[in-house]
Amino acid sequence: MFENPTKPEMEAFLRRIRTVAVLGLSATPGKPSHHVAEELQKFGYRIVPVNPAAPQILGEKSWPDLESAMKGAGPIDVVDVFRRPEHVAEIVDEAIRLKVPAVWLQEGVIDEAAAQKARDAGIFTVMDRCMFKTRRAMGA
């Protein structure tokens, strides 16, 4: 059974990273993915939107897919996933192929087998946790 990293491991990770690709980032203010990405920007993270339907979100160029984002936006530290659970296995396979260093599956995005596969491939993996809430709980 997949287990998330410990709280200290997640906190150390969030202190270390700088660039977050948000897969499934909505251009619509008020949507959870938009709110989380906006709040992560306030913490100083660079957001790389991945949404084929929007040219720009939150002042950043949006990319149609993860591969083009990784090639065009420069190094990405983590992929924050706002997609339905049935898409996670495919996302993890792509993350492994692209050598993504970390995958963070937001609240409600649960696929234990895919999360374990990512971890087994050496990818720092968090499942069913909100990156923003975890970062906010750390304080300044």
Summary of predicted features, one role per range:
Residues L23-K31, E38-L58:
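NAD(P)-binding Rossmann-fold cofactor-contacting core
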Residues E107-R135:
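Rossmann-fold NAD(P)-binding glycine/threonine-rich loop
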Residues H87-W104:
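Rossmann-fold NAD(P) dinucleotide-binding segment
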Residues M1-T6, I57-A89:
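Glycine-rich, highly charged phosphate/nucleotide-binding loops
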